[in-house]
Amino acid sequence: MKDVFLKCEARYDNCAFHFVSASPFQLYEDLSSFFELEGFPLATYHLKRIRVKDKTLLQLFADPFDYKIGQIERILHKYPKRKFILIGDSGEKDPEVYIELYRRYPKQIEKIWIRNVNDADASRMEGVDGAKWRYFSTGSDLMEEI
């Protein structure tokens, strides 16, 4: 996937990366170090803020749908003139999250790329223009689209 990100960075002017995950913020250091060591482009990280000593810990087990919608909407609102390629996987709620965001922001969502990790059914992408999305297995599947 690193090659996909690097090719996007080279291909698109003012390309920026925003990693949104329902993982806890406590993983930030490990995630950012991994991406840096592997040579990924710089990015912002949007992770769940939880604390063990209060009720925010329960958010760790909450459905990621609302969290991801909220985080990505903040980014879309902050950069209303940018076009976005949403990249996720079929393992959790990414297809549903991205479809909802596409419905709300069709002019900003340029592409939706979903790594198919569990033989996902294409019907999950119902309502999205077929030219706007695709399932993929490896990053090399996307290289020709960039």
Q: Language-model features: where?
A:
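Short, surface-exposed connector motifs at secondary-structure boundaries
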Residues: 10-18, 77-84
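C-terminal cap/substrate-recognition subdomain and adjoining C-terminal extension
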Residues: 23-146
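Short, acidic loop-to-helix structural element flanking the phosphoryl-transfer center
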Residues: 1-17, 25-29, 66
